[in-house]
């Protein structure tokens, strides 16, 4: 591969050769654009729109449009895109990922493809990782777009519905990945189409694309309401778990990030909970709580995985070190941590709507992204999102010196060496950014530096508010900044003249992350736009990466050398062992994400069907034909599932059939068994359908045609939503137990697809039955008005969200329970065949 690259160039170099002629055309138009008057810019925008309407393609107008934006930026904000930024703009317009190093002006680059694609009138979303960056980037670039006659909006967390509609109605909309995703989910829960805020998803430019599409890929967006389970069991399970002895009663698997009971632990559980067989299916509730309590107490670490703030457990993002306000671990883990830490245990939530970032962003017509580090994950971008990665050349050559890793035997020796290095460089005034992997480590290092009298600033999840301000001073002379991982990403570190003379920004990594990309991001904070700088990672054999994934061979060599804890090793073998450990973890994580996507694709296809149908109900005014089809399906399926063809059971079956339909849509005693006992199956269907349709027609006359249409719409939407929420829960439970199928020589993914599909079919029938039932039992005093309905859900990311009333869960019949209609058959073989 290396030889081929030398002959033909890398993939990026080959692709850039195709982009260069386009950029030459853009640059050639520079003089023409400079001759335009200010008022001509808006006229050019109108001209482009008109050309597109007449059939020209975006690529036809691209050189001229890019040249126009370039000149507009120069006149409004005093910045002119240089050649490399124009290349980046073309790559993004083509629906690719542009790898642009820190400080190369990604925010300015985005204006080029955003403007061109906004000319279609279908909207462009520019996605950033937090509200601060979304607002900052919008404020910085708005003068450029407005000068060109385009409207630009920003979606912030605290906006109301009208403000969101206005922002999404703009030509270009800035916002965070979570706001865009949650708005999509909320739009699919509204009762009136006027309440929707988003348009169809057209073109998205994702800033820090690796962070959003890879690091966050496993994080589902969940809108939840409050569940109804008691929280007491979490406290009991916590009390039991704290009485256990490590290794004897339970074991911890660090690679899998889990803990499980040993045989001895199981015996203790049976005695404590007074059950005969802990593994019994009827004890699943106990198992669930114990597993989560074990994980909370012995796997999850305070100030690394979560932190406590004002009596609340906040998740700490493992990639950015930021506190994820309002986000909660799912599946009861958050409650188990609350019980462990002795804070108030909140009730488990019920999922009302959910989607992963993977599936949300794959819905855009065109997707592109920017980041400083994407190449290590190129395969994943290509395989999952169909995006290729193009490395954009830097404007100035990178002058940063990346030193080899220094490896120590113990963590204590490593931190002593880090402090010595900081003290040494502090004396000559060189600014330093020290990256740590957890709050705990950053605070430990901070106290060591205090003892040495080195002034410094700490940036971690606890001080999130000051993040941008702290990071903006990190390039000043003699400034030492300790930051958890990638905190402050998106804010440039600019060097002062004195700092530059002292050697530029020194990056010190206190531990290798399990992903090479995160390490590269930390390195990339130094050496922006040709600035001087330096980087070095300090590693110990006690670090998580080396301990869990490193090779025992290294440990053996170190032991043979008999190194003291503060003696360092610099060797190629150790460096390559670290890299292979990282590759191992990256491969492992990619496989996990791929498998999760296979599972998520099942429910994603189902979600698409439900949301598409829901949208049609919202848009369509008249559902009469659909309702009549539902009535026919309910009646016909009821007849098919109740009548077996066994003569001696015929009368009983007819009675059960009539009872069943009386519960749904027939008035009592309207149809008697004797009226239908001499008819064939087909005649019974027609007779019953005629009776039900007559009632429907009568109801329509009583209530009024306009009102009944509105009632049908509201009932159908409510039933779809309720059944879909229950289905999400059911699919979740199915997924949790599906791994055990491997023991039965079954492919778990195939089993999940097959059973999930069956459950979906059942849900569709349930929707029909319940819609008909509610419609035939509705009594109207006053017509429902088309007014703004109160939201009954809260998003799980919103710390200020109002506490909602618990959703009442209907008593649901198990598939293997006896059917309530009295037939003596199992529910799944009787009414359950259609419900």
From Swiss-Prot:
Residues annotated for Zn(2+) binding in this entry: 819, 821, 830-831
InterPro entries (UniProt xref): Helicase_ATP-bd, Helicase_C-like, P-loop_NTPase, SEC_C_motif, SecA, SecA_CS, SecA_DEAD, SecA_motor_DEAD
A GO molecular-function annotation: metal ion binding
Cofactors required: Zn(2+)
GO cellular component terms given for this protein: cell envelope Sec protein transport complex; cytoplasm; plasma membrane
SMART domains in UniProt: SecA_DEAD, SecA_PP_bind
Cofactor remark: May bind 1 zinc ion per subunit.
EC numbers on record: 7.4.2.8
Alphabetical list of SUPFAM superfamilies matching this protein: Helical scaffold and wing domains of SecA, P-loop containing nucleoside triphosphate hydrolases, Pre-protein crosslinking domain of SecA
Keywords of this entry: ATP-binding, Cell membrane, Cytoplasm, Membrane, Metal-binding, Nucleotide-binding, Protein transport, Translocase, Translocation, Transport, Zinc
Membrane association type: Peripheral membrane protein
Signal sequence coordinates: none
Family annotation (HAMAP family): SecA
Quaternary data: Monomer and homodimer. Part of the essential Sec protein translocation apparatus which comprises SecA, SecYEG and auxiliary proteins SecDF. Other proteins may also be involved.
PANTHER family named in the record: CHLOROPLAST PROTEIN-TRANSPORTING ATPASE (PTHR30612:SF0), SECA INNER MEMBRANE COMPONENT OF SEC PROTEIN SECRETION SYSTEM (PTHR30612)
Biological role: Part of the Sec protein translocase complex. Interacts with the SecYEG preprotein conducting channel. Has a central role in coupling the hydrolysis of ATP to the transfer of proteins into and across the cell membrane, serving as an ATP-driven molecular motor driving the stepwise translocation of polypeptide chains across the membrane.
Protein name from the UniProt record: Protein translocase subunit SecA
Organism: Clostridium botulinum (strain Hall / ATCC 3502 / NCTC 13319 / Type A)
Gene field: secA
């Amino acid at each position: 591969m290396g030889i081929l690259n030398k002959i033909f160039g890398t993939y990026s170099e080959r692709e850039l050769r195709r982009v260069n002629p386009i950029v030459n055309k853009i640059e050639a138009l520079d003089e023409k654009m400079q001759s335009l008057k200010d008022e001509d810019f808006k006229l050019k925008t109108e001209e482009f729109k008109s050309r597109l309407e007449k059939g020209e393609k975006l690529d036809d107008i691209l050189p001229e449009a890019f040249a126009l934006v370039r000149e507009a930026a120069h006149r409004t904000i005093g910045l002119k895109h240089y050649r490399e930024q124009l290349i980046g703009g073309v790559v993004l317009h083509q629906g690719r990922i542009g790898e642009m190093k820190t400080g190369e002006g990604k925010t300015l680059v985005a204006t080029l493809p955003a403007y061109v694609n906004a000319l279609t009138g279908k909207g462009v979303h520019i996605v950033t990782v937090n509200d601060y960056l979304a607002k900052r980037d919008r404020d910085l670039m708005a003068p450029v777009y407005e000068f060109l006659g385009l409207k630009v909006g920003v979606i912030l967390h605290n906006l109301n519905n009208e403000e969101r509609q206005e922002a999404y109605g703009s030509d270009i909309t800035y916002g965070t990945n979570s706001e865009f995703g949650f708005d999509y989910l909320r739009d699919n829960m509204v009762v009136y189409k006027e309440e929707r805020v988003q348009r169809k998803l057209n073109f998205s430019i994702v800033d820090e694309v690796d962070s959003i599409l890879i690091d966050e890929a496993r994080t589902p967006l969940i809108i939840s309401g409050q569940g109804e389970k008691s929280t007491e069991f979490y406290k009991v399970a916590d009390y039991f778990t704290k009485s256990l002895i490590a290794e004897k009663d339970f074991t911890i698997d660090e690679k899998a990030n889990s803990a499980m009971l040993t045989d001895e632990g199981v015996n203790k559980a049976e005695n404590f909970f007074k059950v005969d067989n802990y593994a019994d299916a009827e004890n699943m509730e106990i198992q669930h709580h114990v597993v989560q309590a074990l994980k909370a107490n012995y796997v999850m670490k305070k100030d690394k995985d979560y932190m406590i703030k004002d009596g609340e457990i906040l998740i700490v993002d493992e990639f950015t070190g930021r506190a994820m306000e309002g986000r909660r671990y799912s599946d009861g883990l958050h409650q188990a941590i609350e019980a462990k830490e002795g804070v108030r245990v909140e009730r488990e939530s019920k999922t009302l709507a959910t989607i992963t970032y993977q599936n949300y962003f794959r819905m855009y017509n065109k997707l592109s992204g920017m980041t400083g580090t994407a190449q290590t994950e190129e395969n994943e971008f290509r395989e999952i999102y169909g995006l290729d990665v193009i490395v954009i050349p830097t404007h100035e050559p990178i002058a940063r010196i990346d030193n080899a890793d220094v490896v120590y035997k113990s963590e204590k020796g490593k931190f002593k060496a880090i402090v010595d290095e900081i003290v040494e460089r502090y004396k000559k005034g060189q600014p330093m950014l020290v990256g740590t992997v957890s709050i705990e480590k950053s605070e430990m290092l901070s106290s060591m530096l205090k003892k040495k009298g080195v002034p410094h600033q700490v940036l971690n999840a606890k001080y999130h508010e000051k993040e941008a301000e702290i990071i903006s001073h990190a390039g000043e002379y003699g400034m030492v900044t300790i930051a958890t991982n990638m905190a402050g990403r998106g804010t440039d570190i600019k060097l002062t003249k004195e700092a530059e003379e002292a050697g530029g920004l020194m990056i010190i990594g206190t531990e290798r992350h399990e992903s090479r990309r995160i390490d590269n991001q930390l390195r990339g904070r130094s050496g922006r736009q040709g600035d001087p700088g330096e980087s070095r990672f300090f590693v110990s054999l006690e670090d998580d990466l080396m301990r869990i994934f490193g090779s025992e061979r290294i440990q053996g060599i170190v032991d043979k050398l008999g190194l003291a804890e503060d003696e360092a090793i610099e060797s190629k073998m150790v460096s390559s062992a670290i890299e292979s450990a990282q590759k191992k973890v990256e491969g492992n994580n990619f496989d996990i994400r791929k498998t999760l996507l296979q599972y998520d694709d099942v429910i994603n296809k189902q979600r698409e069907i439900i949301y598409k149908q829901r949208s049609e109900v919202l848009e369509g005014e008249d559902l009469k034909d659909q309702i009549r089809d539902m009535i026919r399906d309910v009646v016909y399926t009821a007849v098919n599932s109740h009548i077996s063809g066994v003569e001696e059971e015929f009368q009983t079956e007819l009675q059960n059939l009539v009872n069943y339909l009386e519960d749904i849509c027939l008035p009592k005693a309207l149809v008697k068994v004797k009226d239908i006992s001499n008819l064939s199956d087909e005649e019974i269907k027609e007779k019953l359908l005629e009776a039900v349709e007559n009632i429907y027609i009568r109801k329509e006359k009583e209530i009024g045609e306009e009102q009944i249409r509105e009632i049908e719409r509201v009932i159908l939407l409510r039933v779809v939503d309720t059944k879909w929420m229950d289905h999400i829960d059911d699919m979740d439970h199915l997924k949790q137990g599906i791994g055990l199928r491997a023991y039965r020589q079954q492919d778990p993914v195939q089993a999940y697809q097959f059973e999930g599909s069956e459950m979906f079919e059942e849900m569709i029938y349930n929707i029909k039955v319940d819609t008909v039932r509610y419609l035939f039992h509705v009594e109207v005093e006053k017509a429902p008005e088309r007014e703004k309905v109160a939201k009954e859900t809260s998003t799980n990311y919103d710390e200020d969200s109002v506490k909602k009333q618990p959703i009442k869960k209907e008593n649901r019949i198990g598939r293997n329970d006896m059917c309530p209609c009295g037939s003596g058959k199992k529910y799944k073989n009787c009414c359950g065949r259609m419900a």
